Amino acid sequence: MSEIQSLTERALADVAAAQTPDQLEALRVALLGKSGSITAQLKQLGTLPAEQRKAAGEAINLSRDALTAALAERKHTLETAALDARLAGERIDVTLPGRRSERGGLHPVTRTLERIVEIFARLGYELSDGPEIEDDWHNFEALNFPPHHPARAMHDTFYFGDGRLLRTHTSGVQVRYMDAHKPPLRMIAAGKVYRSDSDQTHSPMFHQVEGLLVDEHSNFADLKGTLSEFVRAFFERDFEMRFRPSYFPFVEPGAEVDIAWQQPDGSTRWLEVLGCGMVHPNVLRSVGIDPERYTGFAFGLGVERFAMLRYGVNDLRAFFENDVRFLRQFA
């Protein structure tokens, strides 16, 4: 009994003197492990006379419980001290000056797109949206694109294996809108479009805005008036404009719109800014609208083109290179 008591006292002193978790773990193994001294005492109970076993067993169990509690308490003390030391080393000096948050800004293409949408909203046009992954019907067939049209070629259009494609224009939204609404109607579709083309003035992905008006009395004069008002409102000045005959499968007659753009040297040159025309009767028929009763006009423009003109950017690719030095100019 005195041997167990003496062993317990020495062990408790060693536990209290342990300075690291590793030292404490070594003591636990030496005392309570499979080959530990307390465990050895338990194994020797069978060699004692029967009348001594009960008292010796109780003493050994009390010793084991006391050591287990002491080990747990010392472990908690060491862990708390280590945490306090780490927190003291990581203490934040609240008197140091803070870092100001960087102020963000809208991308110039986003600014331009919102400006275009806002102008047409004032003219009574409703904004509509549609999928960027289209089917052949909405992207080509319903818009009077014949099967042999060059726009269907692989070098102009990104096709998927199942026959679907990345939309080459937002005109498919017009088809969906006419399917869901009855004339008279005014709408614009804005979003990303995709074509296999990349150079200083073209990108394989760009943003487009297309507009559509259908009613019983619309004519080309209405179209010219609408686009003249839009150009004046967007650039906040008057331009001399001309409408050149051009071919688009979904309009007849079709035209491209040029504005007299002043160069840095003071000279003026004609600059193409958008395409337009009267909606082709076949397009109206494809969505169940009677072309004998209704007429309409449509127009489309590249958002990046207008952003380049508004901000004086010469290379379209600068909009997509994510150079903060470039983008910060427009924030």
UniProtKB/Swiss-Prot annotation:
Keywords on record: Aminoacyl-tRNA synthetase, ATP-binding, Cytoplasm, Ligase, Magnesium, Metal-binding, Nucleotide-binding, Protein biosynthesis
Cofactor: Mg(2+)
GO biological process, one term: phenylalanyl-tRNA aminoacylation
A GO molecular-function descriptor: tRNA binding
UniProt EC number: 6.1.1.20
Keyword Nucleotide-binding found: yes
Any single Gene Ontology cellular-component annotation: cytoplasm
Chief localisation class: cytoplasm
Stored Pfam families: Phe_tRNA-synt_N, tRNA-synt_2d
InterPro entries per UniProt: aa-tRNA-synth_II (IPR006195), aa-tRNA-synth_II/BPL/LPL (IPR045864), Phe-tRNA-synth_IIc_asu (IPR004529), Phe-tRNA_ligase_II_N (IPR004188), Phe_tRNA_ligase_alpha1_bac (IPR022911), Phenylalanyl-tRNA_Synthase (IPR002319), tRNA-bd_arm (IPR010978)
CDD domains, alphabetized: PheRS_alpha_core
Top EC class of this enzyme: ligase
Subcellular location: Cytoplasm
Cofactor binding: number and manner: Binds 2 magnesium ions per tetramer.
Origin: domain of life: Bacteria
Protein residues bound to Mg(2+): 252
Catalytic reaction list: tRNA(Phe) + L-phenylalanine + ATP = L-phenylalanyl-tRNA(Phe) + AMP + diphosphate + H(+)
HAMAP family per the UniProt record, alphabetical: Phe_tRNA_synth_alpha1 (MF_00281)
Subunit structure: Tetramer of two alpha and two beta subunits.
Family per similarity comment: Belongs to the class-II aminoacyl-tRNA synthetase family. Phe-tRNA synthetase alpha subunit type 1 subfamily.
Name the record gives this protein: Phenylalanine--tRNA ligase alpha subunit
The encoding gene: pheS
